[in-house]
C-alpha cells in the first residue's frame, strides 16, 4: 500500500458526430474534452474512509472496521466482478442509502464504495483513506462526468493498492500508465459506471481513460491514432432533457417514415466517416481549408439532427447566435437541450470569440472555451496543476 498523496485527473467527453445514428448501427466519433475531474487521495491512520464531493455538497465517512466486517465474499467472482443487484442492495445498507436511491449523488457514493471494497479487498486490512473529488464538468449534461469520476476513483485506488504502477515514481510532474494498466483502470471504471447507469456502452469510460478520440460502432471501439488539437466553445443550454425519450422518439419516427429516416441515418454515418478522414489528414499535414470542411460537416449534421426530431429552440438559438459571429455549431449528445459545440479555428480574432461567449451567456447559457482530443487519465504532482484547481482540492 502506497503511503503518499495521489493526485489524478480524467477528461470528460463530447460526441463530435454520430449521436442517435450510433443507436442504429452507425459510426459515432467521441472525443475527450479538456474539462477534467480531479481526485486527491490522502492515506490516513484514523480507521476511517471519507469521500468528499464538494461540487454536490456531499461528505460521507465510513468506519473501516465496519466495512472490514462486511462479507465481501460476494466480490470474489473472477478478476473484475460485475456488480449484481443483490450486492448493490447490501452496499446501499452500508452506505446508509434508501433502497430506491436513484439520484446521481447517492449512486456516486455507491460506485465509490463498490470500487473501494472490490479493489482494496486484496490488502491485509482495508486502508484508511481521505478522498476528495472535484470537477470542472457540469453533472447530467451528457459530458461523461460520471465516467470521469469512475476513472479517477479506479486509477487512484489501483495505484494506492499497487495493483498498477505509479506513473510518478520517477518524480515527474505529470504521467500516464502503461497500456496494460490503462486496460485494468478502464475495466474497473466500467464497473463503476454500471453501478451508476446500469448498462452503459463503455464509450465514456474508454474516452476518459485513453483520451484523444474513439470511433464506436455496434459495440466495437477503436482509437483514432492521430488527432489535431481542436479548440471549441462548449455551451450548456441548461435545458433538461430525457435521453431515453429522445432515443425513443427517433425510433418511432424511423418506424413511421422508414424511407425518409433510413437515408438520414446513412447520411449522418457518411458525415462521421468524412470527419474521421479529414481529422487524419489534418494530423498529418494541416491546411486551413480542412477547418472549412469541419465547419460544413457540423452545419450539415445539425440540420440532420433537427430532421431526426432531436433539436430544441435553445439549440437553434445557440446556432444562430454563433452564426452571427461567423462560427459554426451543432448539438452534442442526446439533443433536446443539453450542450452544443462550436468550432474555433486557428487565427480567429479574440474579439469575435469573446463577443460570441458574451452573447451566449446573455441567453442564459453556460459557456467554456476548451479543447478536444485531450489527454486521458493522468497522475499529477501538486505543482503541475493550475491554482484554482489546487485551491478547490485544498492542496
Curated annotation (Swiss-Prot):
- The UniProt record lists the EC number as 2.7.1.36
Q: Name one GO molecular function term.
A: mevalonate kinase activity
Checking InterPro entries in the record gives: GHMP_kinase_C_dom, GHMP_kinase_C_sf, GHMP_kinase_N_dom, GHMP_knse_ATP-bd_CS, Mev_gal_kin, Ribosomal_Su5_D2-typ_SF, Ribsml_uS5_D2-typ_fold_subgr
Also noted in the record is:
The authors of PubMed:14730012 identify two forms of Mvk in rat liver, one form localizes to the cytosol and the other form to the peroxisome, whereas according to the authors of PubMed:14730012 the protein is found only in the cytoplasm with no evidence for its peroxisomal localization.
Which protein, by its recorded name, is this? Mevalonate kinase
Please give the organism. Answer: Rattus norvegicus (Rat)
Q: What does this protein do?
A: Catalyzes the phosphorylation of mevalonate to mevalonate 5-phosphate, a key step in isoprenoid and cholesterol biosynthesis.
What does the record give as the reaction this protein catalyses? (R)-mevalonate + ATP = (R)-5-phosphomevalonate + ADP + H(+)
User: Which residues are recorded as binding Mg(2+)?
Assistant: 146, 193
Which keywords describe this protein according to UniProt?
Answer: ATP-binding, Cholesterol biosynthesis, Cholesterol metabolism, Cytoplasm, Kinase, Lipid biosynthesis, Lipid metabolism, Magnesium, Metal-binding, Nucleotide-binding, Peroxisome, Steroid biosynthesis, Steroid metabolism, Sterol biosynthesis, Sterol metabolism, Transferase
Broadest EC class assigned to this enzyme: transferase
The record's PROSITE patterns line, in alphabetical order, gives: GHMP_KINASES_ATP
Phenotype upon changing residue 20 to K? Induce significant secondary structural change
Mention any one GO cellular component term assigned to this protein in its UniProt record. Answer: peroxisome
Quaternary data: Homodimer.
Which residues participate in ATP binding? 13, 55, 104, 108, 135, 140-146
Amino acid at each position: 500500500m502506497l503511503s503518499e498523496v495521489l493526485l489524478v485527473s480524467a477528461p470528460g467527453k463530447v460526441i463530435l458526430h454520430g449521436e442517435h445514428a450510433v443507436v442504429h448501427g452507425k459510426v459515432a466519433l467521441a472525443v475527450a474534452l479538456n474539462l477534467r475531474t480531479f481526485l486527491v487521495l490522502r492515506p490516513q491512520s484514523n480507521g476511517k474512509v471519507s469521500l468528499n464531493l464538494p461540487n454536490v455538497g456531499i461528505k460521507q465517512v465510513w468506519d473501516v472496521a465496519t466495512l472490514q466486517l462486511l462479507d465481501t465474499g460476494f466480490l470474489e467472482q473472477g478478476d473484475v466482478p460485475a456488480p449484481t443487484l443483490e450486492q448493490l442492495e447490501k452496499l446501499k445498507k452500508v452506505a446508509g442509502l434508501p433502497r430506491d436511491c436513484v439520484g446521481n449523488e447517492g449512486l456516486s457514493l455507491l460506485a465509490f464504495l463498490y470500487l473501494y471494497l472490490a479493489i482494496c479487498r486484496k490488502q491485509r486490512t482495508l486502508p484508511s483513506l481521505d478522498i476528495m473529488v472535484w470537477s470542472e464538468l457540469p453533472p447530467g449534461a451528457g459530458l461523461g462526468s460520471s465516467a470521469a469520476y469512475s476513472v479517477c476513483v479506479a486509477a487512484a485506488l489501483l495505484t494506492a493498492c499497487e495493483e498498477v504502477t505509479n506513473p510518478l515514481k520517477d518524480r515527474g510532474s505529470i504521467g500516464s500508465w502503461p497500456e496494460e494498466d490503462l486496460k485494468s483502470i478502464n475495466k474497473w471504471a466500467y464497473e463503476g459506471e454500471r453501478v451508476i447507469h446500469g448498462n452503459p456502452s463503455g464509450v465514456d469510460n474508454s474516452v476518459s481513460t485513453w483520451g484523444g478520440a474513439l470511433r464506436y460502432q455496434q459495440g466495437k471501439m477503436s482509437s483514432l491514432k492521430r488527432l489535431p488539437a481542436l479548440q471549441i466553445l462548449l455551451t450548456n443550454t441548461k435545458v433538461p432533457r430525457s435521453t431515453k425519450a429522445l432515443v425513443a422518439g427517433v425510433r418511432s419516427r424511423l418506424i413511421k417514415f422508414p424511407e425518409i429516416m433510413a437515408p438520414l441515418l446513412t447520411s449522418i454515418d457518411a458525415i462521421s466517416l468524412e470527419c474521421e478522414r479529414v481529422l487524419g489528414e489534418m494530423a498529418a499535414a494541416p491546411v486551413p481549408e480542412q477547418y472549412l470542411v469541419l465547419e460544413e460537416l457540423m452545419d450539415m449534421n445539425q440540420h440532420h439532427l433537427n430532421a431526426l426530431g432531436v433539436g430544441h429552440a435553445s439549440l437553434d438559438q445557440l446556432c444562430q447566435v454563433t452564426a452571427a459571429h461567423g462560427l459554426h455549431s451543432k448539438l452534442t449528445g442526446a439533443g433536446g437541450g443539453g450542450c452544443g459545440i462550436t468550432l474555433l479555428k486557428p487565427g480567429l480574432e479574440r474579439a469575435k470569440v469573446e463577443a460570441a461567449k458574451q452573447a451566449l451567456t446573455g441567453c442564459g447559457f453556460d459557456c467554456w472555451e476548451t479543447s478536444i482530443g485531450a489527454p486521458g487519465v493522468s497522475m499529477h504532482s501538486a505543482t503541475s496543476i493550475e491554482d484554482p484547481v489546487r485551491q478547490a482540492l485544498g492542496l
